[in-house]
C-alpha cells in the first residue's frame, strides 16, 4: 500500500517506501510512528485509531511501509517525535 505521513511539526518527508500486501484486502491502516532527530522511524504501531481494516495481512505490510519512510533530519527536533503514516491498500495491489 501507499503511505503518507503527518503530525511531525512540519518536518518534510524525504523518502517513502511501499510494501505490497500478501492478500486481497482493501482499506486504510493508520500506523503511529516515532521518528528520531535523523528522520528515521524508530518505532511503529499499526492499526491505531482511524484504521478501517485491521486484517493481520494488512497490519504487517503497513508497519513495514512506515519503517521505510524517512524524514529530513532536524537537530532541533525532540529525540523521539510522534507522528502517523496512513497506508491505503487497494484490491489487487
Stretches with model-predicted labels:
Residues 1-24, 28:
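Intrinsic-disorder/low-complexity signature in envelope-associated proteins
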Residues 7, 23-30, 34-80:
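A short, well-structured alpha-helical segment
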Residues 12, 77-78, 90:
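A generic structural signal for solvent-exposed, polar alpha-helical segments
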Residues 13-15, 21, 44, 48, ...:
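Generic, low-specificity signal for short hydrophobic/alpha-helical stretches with a mild N-terminal bias
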Residues 82-84:
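C-terminal partner/receptor-binding element of secreted or periplasmic proteins
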Residues 86-93:
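Short, low-complexity, Pro/Ser/Thr/Gly-rich segments in the mature regions of secreted, periplasmic
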Amino acid at each position: 500500500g501507499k503511505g503518507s505521513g503527518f503530525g511531525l511539526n512540519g518536518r518534510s518527508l524525504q523518502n517513502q517506501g511501499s510494501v505490497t500486501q500478501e492478500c486481497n484486502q482493501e482499506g486504510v491502516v493508520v500506523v503511529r510512528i516515532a521518528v528520531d532527530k535523523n528522520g528515521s522511524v524508530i518505532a511503529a504501531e499499526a492499526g491505531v485509531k482511524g484504521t478501517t481494516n485491521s486484517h493481520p495481512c494488512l497490519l504487517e505490510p503497513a508497519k513495514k511501509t512506515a519503517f521505510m519512510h524517512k524524514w529530513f533530519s532536524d537537530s532541533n527536533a525532540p529525540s523521539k517525535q510522534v507522528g502517523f503514516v496512513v497506508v491505503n491498500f487497494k484490491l489487487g495491489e
